[in-house]
């Protein structure tokens, strides 16, 4: 006998976030380490929302109560975040590999990454900075990210997204000779 699929979680588009008010939905998503928990709601970033819409975990409505597709959400979000496409591709790849991925904004990175086996860990081990293969990056910019990661005792992972949407990861750090 096939297991009954869980119902999609109702979500609302709210300016630059996606908001969940459904108590069961909040519990299910928070348990899987999605979003930021507030007193009576859970807020999701656009990359989290896109991922959850693509997995059919949430059904997203705008302010006019119109149901939004993945493509419609992507269009809205891309107007706010110019790096949305590459961030989403890296996020999706990391989540599909079983990692817990959280915002890295506080550290000037795209994401904080938690080990797969340590989901309840308080501190992330890695910071992830996402780049497009098609846009040149100055080495001084990468050096700055390495310095920040080192100063907060984290390892820096550079995620490079190519034209096909594939992601390659590089671990960056200091080498003392």
From Swiss-Prot:
Catalyzed reactions per annotation: pretRNA = a 3'-half-tRNA molecule with a 5'-OH end + a 5'-half-tRNA molecule with a 2',3'-cyclic phosphate end + an intron with a 2',3'-cyclic phosphate and a 5'-hydroxyl terminus
Keywords: Lyase, tRNA processing
Subunit organization: Homotetramer; although the tetramer contains four active sites, only two participate in the cleavage. Therefore, it should be considered as a dimer of dimers.
A single Gene Ontology CC term: cytoplasm
Lineage, broadest ranks: Archaea, Methanobacteriati, Methanobacteriota, Methanomada group, Methanococci
Keyword field contains Transmembrane helix: no
Xref: SUPFAM superfamilies: tRNA-intron endonuclease catalytic domain-like, tRNA-intron endonuclease N-terminal domain-like
GO BP term (any one): tRNA splicing, via endonucleolytic cleavage and ligation
The protein, known as: tRNA-splicing endonuclease
Assigned EC number: 4.6.1.16
Pfam family of the protein (one): tRNA_int_endo_N
Active site: 114, 123, 154
Its job: Endonuclease that removes tRNA introns. Cleaves pre-tRNA at the 5'- and 3'-splice sites to release the intron. The products are an intron and two tRNA half-molecules bearing 2',3' cyclic phosphate and 5'-OH termini. Recognizes a pseudosymmetric substrate in which 2 bulged loops of 3 bases are separated by a stem of 4 bp.
Superkingdom to which the source organism belongs: Archaea
Assigned protein family: Belongs to the tRNA-intron endonuclease family. Archaeal short subfamily.
Molecular function terms, GO-annotated: lyase activity; nucleic acid binding; tRNA-intron endonuclease activity
